[in-house]
Amino acid sequence: MTPARGDTAIHRGLRVSSPARMWCELSVDLALPELVAAGDYLVQWEFPIIGIDALSEAVERYPVRVGGARLRHAAGLLDAHSESPMESELRVIVVTGGLPPVTANLWIPTSSGHRYRGDLVFEGRRVIVEYQSVFHFGPEAFRKDMTRISRLEANVWAVIQVNLDDLGTPIELVARIRRVLDRRQLSR
């Protein structure tokens, strides 16, 4: 297939695929969570490389035989508010696990006047799922996280902390989140 105008660009003297076309091509090699993470990076709200609508159009423009269903599924899961690949992968596990709708990086006010962002927020149930990477284990980050989580819990938010090990057991992770959501539903 010969690339159409706009499908490629010159980068450092080499002709390369456009971001939209490259994302479609990656569907052959990447699993759904990784493909969504790559797409979220491209559409990230603060510094977007391309818009969600443009990626969705690319899915129709660049049909792929292998990975086509995965590509269409990934396009429907993109979120411009995701801020890390692991956060995107966690969101894919949550969404495909059949849990209620979740909002990425929602600002949450507290009674003390502080505002904190939750990685994945089930706003109606006041449940936050936080991905804790190694970045959070330094002394200063750890202290800030403790204060943030304590203040959120004091404002009747449940905070579920997740790490890389949890992503390796998605069924157990979804079940754990579901139990907390169910308890929060009963207590309302």
Feature names for model-found ranges:
Residues 1-51:
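Hydrophobic alpha-helical segments and helix pairs
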Residues 44-188:
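Surface segments flanking catalytic/ligand-binding clefts of nucleic-acid enzymes
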